[in-house]
Amino acid sequence: GEHFCGRVPPIAVLPNGKTNLIALDLGIHGDPIKALERIVEIAKSGLGDHVVQRELIALTDGQTTRPVLGMFLGGAGLADYILYCRDKIYPLGLSNGFSHFLTALAVLASLVFGIRARFLPQSSHPVSISLMREGQLAGRFSVLIVTTLERLLLGVDPGDSRRGNMKLMAVDQSVSALLRLVWASVFRRMGKQQMQGIHLEQGDTIRIEGAQSSVILDGEIFRASEGKPILLRSTEPVPFLRLAA
């Protein structure tokens, strides 16, 4: 914001990656050139209702001199699955959809059937998650998500934003918890009631700590360790451009 005199102009995000979660949350998808053309049209005709406010996640790990900003963080087992897909599946040159399908099959083979092999994802490391004023979670999680996007991965919406701007979902590393997650996501039941093994929380400050535990913030990898936690804080609202008014 220091590069602009006065009010910061809205930020437009173009789809240019494998998942594009931020762009999708803002209604921007498909060909980035066509999306840019649409953005130019909106800018010429007036931004109006296309400007929305979004908080960012500010990550510090004790090593970076300035906070790293993002909107979607994956940790615990999810970070391992993302890295597995990036390192093992994407190099095969397959389409994004088929690559994600193969990754899902590998995760199921590892978690559900207990198959252990070098070419399959490994078990997640124990991690401790602390939320200011909300207590602490500790254990092995197959999924850990922290985001300021309106909707989480799989369409999950934890609800009440008054408890904090960062939304957290942690799923225990167990077959039963994973099946409950799939069932609740398919039938849009997530957040409607408490479910064993699925933790939905919100807060403005989140601390993640664990031996050799990786997190990925918008594609960038960070590692938490004992005595060197990762600290997440929500920022003040930032204006973004949403294509669908």
Residue ranges, per PLM feature:
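Conserved Motif II region of HX4D acyltransferases
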Residues: 1, 144, 219
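Catalytic core of DAGKc-family lipid kinases
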Residues: 4-138, 142
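Flexible loop/turn segments at secondary-structure boundaries
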Residues: 21, 152-153
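ATP/nucleoside-binding phosphotransfer catalytic cores, i.e., glycine-rich phosphate-binding loops
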Residues: 131-138, 154-245
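Glycine-/small-residue-rich beta->alpha transition segments that form the dinucleotide
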Residues: 148-149
